[in-house]
Amino acid sequence: HTMMGRDMVKETNLDKYIKNPSSGNYREKYYTYKGKLPSNEVTLYEDHDLEKGHFWNLSIDLTACTGCGECVISCQAENNIPVVGKEEMRKSRDMHWMRIDRYYSSEMTKEVSKKEDISSIKMYAEMEEPSENPEVVFQPVMCMHCNHAPCENVCPVAATTHSNEGLNQMTYNRCIGTRYCANNCPYKVRRFNWFLYSENDRFDYHMNDDLGKMVLNPDVVVRSRGVIEKCSMCIQKIQALKLEAKIKGEPIKDEDAQTVCASSCSTNAIVFGDYNNKDSEVRKLRKDERAYDLLDHLNVRPSVFYQTKVRNKQNA
């Protein structure tokens, strides 16, 4: 699996952004029997009815993100995610629900490869070599909670399903570990429990002793061996907020709805909220001209979206 060659990060410079707020944010069109259509209008799926009740969305501003990792650490602590160590990481058995992808600019570009008639394999190999003074982009990636989710329709036991609030849910005690969902996920954000980390002395980090277990979040289940896990959009916090609002007999306030990654972000790069709340910040951001979906050509309609990165260059 590689993400090379795909438009993961969309960016522009300040001068172009001032003239045109949608600069850098383009959507490709595809040939269909109805003519050329943008990717968000081409689909085989039936739409979910998400106009009633809540519709949870999350925005990530690439301009504001500094790649500090606060969101990853807070997610790790909040959701009882096991620490697996270097050896497992080398085997690509990481368990982080969030990751921060780093991209460095290179002297090799598609334009240069065409000019020099270089094969695509050699082009991508040379792209891995950063330039002497590279431009850097940090991109947090978690489960996108797609409304046309490729993972949901391949699970043979319906362990991953779609909620009426736009969330992609996991039923851990139904999962049989086929990993079809992880294979079919274009964002590669699903994690498989190769071991029972909480009871295995090999992973002597924080979970498998009496003192360490006191640190675990009692609102989040500790997953067992052989099941898939992923970002839940902090469903435990959402449910607690809904219960509190129900007891008080008042609607949920936009500022009260928070995932732990959003509340821990020191630059406010991550914003969470209810899209169906017409006054919510996340609704305003979704309608912003900088907003785009990761791998939007797939049209999986994610509930997580990004804001185009704006650079303030000297030659802008």
Give, region by region, the residue ranges found by the protein language model.
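Non-ligating segments of multi-cofactor redox enzymes
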Residues: 1-316
